[in-house]
Amino acid sequence: KENLGFSGGNNLGIQAAKGKYLFIINNDTVFKDFYIQALIDRLESSPKIGIVCPKIRFAWGANPIQYAGYTPLSKMTVRNRAIGFGEEDKGQYEIAHPTPYAHGAAMLVKREAVEKVGLMPLCYFLYYEELDWSMMFTRAGYQIWYEPKCTVYHKESQATGQNSPLRTYFITRNRFKLVQRNYGGIYKWLAYAYLFCVVATRDGIKFAFHGHWDLLSAALRGICDFMFNKQSYITK
C-alpha cells in the first residue's frame, strides 16, 4: 500500500468521516481521564473557532507539558515556541486562549470549517503540515484555540525517531516549503537567507563534527529536493 504521509492519511479519514466534528489524533498518544466534551464546548462557543487543541503533556517521567498553545512564527527564523514546553504542570496554563497554530498530535476540527478551508496540504508528507493548515484556517477567518480542560499524553516521535535521517530530511525540506507557501515579499527572502546561511550551515557543521554522516546526507538531500521540487526520502 502507498504511504500517503501524515496529511494524506488524515485527509482520507476526513473524507470518510461523517460527523460534525473531526478529531485528528496521533497514533503515539495516550488518554487518561480524557474529556472531549470540553473541546466540543469550546469549538461551539463561537462560529469563528475552527480548531481546538487540548493541553498536551509528554507520556513519560513526570509528564511535563509539551503544548499549551504556540507563539507566532518568527518572520525571519521560521521558529516559534510551544508555550509551557518542558514545564511541570502546576496549573499555570488553565485558561483557554487563542493560539496561532494547532498541534498535529491532537486537534478537534469543525467539518464545516474544513469544507471552507480545504484539506491538509499534501506537499509536506511529514512535519509542518499542521502549521500550514493552521495558516489556511487563519486566512479563511477562523480562530484556533487551546483548551486546558482536556489533556492528551504524547510519546513524541516514537514512529520516526528524534534524530533519524527521515526526520532530518523532512524537517529541513519542509522549513523551506513553509516559507515558499506562506511568506511574501522581503520576508520570504530574509527567511530563505537565514535558513540557507545560518541553519543549514550550523546543522551541517554539527552533524559532521559528531560523525552523523547519515543526518548530514539527509539534510543536504532535503535542501536539494526543495530546490528541485522533489520528494525522495520516504524510508525509515
Functional labels for PLM-detected ranges:
Residues 1-17, 27:
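Glycine-rich, basic loop-to-helix element that forms the pyrophosphate-binding segment
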Residues 4, 29-30, 56, 124:
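Acidic metal-phosphate-binding loop of nucleotide-sugar-dependent transferases
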Residues 22:
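Short aromatic/hydrophobic "clamp" motif used to bind/position activated sugar donors
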Residues 25-27, 121:
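Active-site acidic Asp-centered loop
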Residues 30-67, 73-75:
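Conserved donor NDP-sugar-binding/catalytic core segment of glycosyltransferases
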Residues 100-151:
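A short, conserved alpha-helix in the catalytic core of glycosyltransferases
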Residues 166-174, 185-236:
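Non-catalytic, C-terminal membrane-associated alpha-helical segments of glycosyltransferases
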